[in-house]
């Protein structure tokens, strides 16, 4: 059965799982998230840097509203939340809905693992047993073993130092979108900064911001590309499905994004104790990091929820980067909670993508004007 509705009671009544992925302001606001920082020579990206923080301040009330609907109409349901920017959303959930049945997730590392499995010769990523830690879009793989316990991390490091996260014979023709090929190649530069573990490719925005700005068209950003390609294809097909009332003959294919969230629902429903990468309160899993930080680490998932795996101490370089980033995210949630201009200014000033407080203030003032319909009034 397929039902399309904007009535919360219809949508949320008698459900076991809410698979949530909202975009407050839609792609029109994403375009501004990207273009406003670029005007000042700063990275313009969906979830990283100033754009991600603007998106976060818009997303918080929408995500909280969805949780309230679920708790009203299906109080025993789980919400599996893909809504971005996941770290800021997760911090808001921790702070304002600490007892809610919400699990925040991201498929970006899973997508990289799909390629990593091919690089290392596995049939698929589920043949690998990984160790990973960090924040959302801000982490590192420290171990990749097969089911017999053989370690492959040094093989992956050697490969990434030479090819990035591309196959040895990769070229842009193997990718539906050439920008993802460029992103995979850039891992070669990221891992060279610390070749002891394998980084998430999103570090390109934090560690090589000038390169990203130089190779971005400030008048036609990633949001515009998505509007002109994926949005037309996917939303057009969804509109057709809604009209005919069935997805039987759809041209859309299930990918890693869908597979991962269904695997999580399956683990919760059937107590499979599957090992999955989730965004959860640290609570000492990373022993030398803030206990209340929302970290992305492997967890064992069953009918009662999740159990995080212990990470232990992390090195100074990774810890320093994470402390800077997590406090940017906390300041954004402070700004939402307190309706504080100062807290949002501090968040932008602290962010690694922003060069100084003067630029942070200019970006913030432009964001306030652009987000009048979405942000709380900042005083």
Please state what every model-predicted region is.
Residues 24-97:
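Rossmann-fold NAD(P)-binding glycine/threonine-rich loop
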